[in-house]
Amino acid sequence: MLKRSLLFLTVLLLLFSFSSITNEVSASSSFDKGKYKKGDDASYFEPTGPYLMVNVTGVDGKRNELLSPRYVEFPIKPGTTLTKEKIEYYVEWALDATAYKEFRVVELDPSAKIEVTYYDKNKKKEETKSFPITEKGFVVPDLSEHIKNPGFNLITKVVIEKK
């Protein structure tokens, strides 16, 4: 009876000692929300539906690079019109993400355009559509039958100046 009691106590002690180790490990590797600020990987969410990805380089009038902000994604809706004014507004937001209220957009590169690439189910091949940036703008097409989250990409140089 004594051997059985000692064996039971030994197993019980081992069980408790391992549970305290595993609790410490899980507590130390838990996610600490206080360490992350808005915009870090912890707060990134993939946009649902179409989005405009703005990836620009800010240059001065002589084409010298002033600012290279990170890219920013903005949700857009099919059927809405993206004019030059709206696109400049999005570009200014992208600039503000790096240097808040320091720069303003003077002009977009004349060759700037917005592109979207997707697999066309009807043609059974990859398609790339380009849309010029004009005052009149273009209507965002509904590509939901081909792709779930189409990314409309603006990758260009933008002439900027200090505010």
UniProtKB/Swiss-Prot annotation:
<feature type="signal peptide">
    <location>
        <begin position="1"/>
        <end position="27"/>
    </location>
</feature>
<keyword id="KW-0732">Signal</keyword>
<dbReference type="InterPro" id="IPR004093">
    <property type="entry name" value="SAK"/>
</dbReference>
<comment type="function">
    <text>Potent plasminogen activator that converts plasminogen into plasmin. It forms a 1:1 complex with plasmin, which in turn activates other plasminogen molecules.</text>
</comment>
<dbReference type="GO" id="GO:0005576">
    <property type="term" value="C:extracellular region"/>
</dbReference>
<dbReference type="InterPro" id="IPR036120">
    <property type="entry name" value="SAK/SK_sf"/>
</dbReference>
<protein>
    <recommendedName>
        <fullName>Staphylokinase</fullName>
    </recommendedName>
</protein>
<comment type="similarity">
    <text>Belongs to the staphylokinase family.</text>
</comment>
<dbReference type="Pfam" id="PF02821">
    <property type="entry name" value="Staphylokinase"/>
</dbReference>
<keyword id="KW-0964">Secreted</keyword>
<keyword id="KW-0617">Plasminogen activation</keyword>
